[in-house]
Amino acid sequence: MRTIDLDASQWRNVSDLYESILPAIGAPEWHGDSINALIDSMIWGGINQIHPPYRIRIMGAKSLPEKIRKEIDHLKTALASHRSDSKRWYGKDVEVEVEVTP
């Protein structure tokens, strides 16, 4: 599985998360900056230049503000849920995950 490393040590706002993830997965310029938009493109859409399987590893997360940690947790939960839906509905596992390291 391909790993995409992101350095979160300088992130201060939730927008920093999206400003790092979107170019890393080759999202088009018009891509939305929300969890729903990420789920649509990562699991369902196929519009990004980087296609599954891949893991996004967020490094340097130990000092992230709480609002960013919550957004990442929400993203991880949503990805797992939609992966499960894809398996159940279409018999296909879309291998995309987010890992967080201190």
What is the role of each PLM region?
Residues 41:
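Short acidic/histidine-centered micro-motifs embedded in hydrophobic/aromatic stretches
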